[in-house]
Amino acid sequence: MDTSRGIDSDLDHFLRYRLDTRYYVSPLNRLTFACSARWGYIEPMNTERIIANDQLFYLGGSANVRGFAENMLRFDTNNNPVGALSSTSGTVEARIDLGHQIELCLFTDSGSLGHYQTSNIPNGFRTSAGLGFRYLTPIGPVGLVYGFKLERESGEDPGRFHVSIGYTF
């Protein structure tokens, strides 16, 4: 739990709750399944019950739902990212050691935002699936992954490439 009390702004007066859990299992020598689930909620403590946009939860990008651009899981009519007071996301990833410090990853990511401060933003989970390769260096993996959006909305691109340094989780 994080607390924030703005110095000169009532917009930064809130409680932020977060839960992040991870699980890893290796049923075979060269195969690891990695699972992650995250939840967050912001409780406004100011009289207007409004939180500054830079303090809201956003989803999309290399850290969570990889089929989407950074923070673009939900967006407004002007194509600007929309944040929310609550966030739920999860990932299941298979990591396959191909030898020679190369790893293949297959994944599915899903996430949902809720309790928007603006109207006309749809609710519900958005999901992506994808694959990528990582080169395992002595200081951590460097990778290139592509996430495909499942159940694309009208006008959306099919997915997104992401370059990563380190594991997503």
Predicted regions and their residues:
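C-terminal outer-membrane beta-barrel translocator/porin domains of Gram-negative envelope proteins
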Residues: 1-98, 106-107, 114-115
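Repeated loop/turn-to-beta-strand initiation elements of outer-membrane beta-barrel proteins
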Residues: 28-33, 100-104, 135-144
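C-terminal beta-signal and adjacent terminal beta-strands/loops
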Residues: 108-121, 139, 154
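A short alpha/beta connector and helix-capping loop motif
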Residues: 119-132
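Residue-level signature of outer-membrane beta-barrel architecture
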Residues: 23-25, 94-96, 135-137, 148, ...
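A generic structural micro-feature
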Residues: 82-84, 123-125, 155-157
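Outer-membrane beta-barrel "beta-signal"
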Residues: 131-142, 158-169
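Short beta-alpha connecting loops at secondary-structure transitions
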Residues: 53, 115, 126-127, 145-147, ...
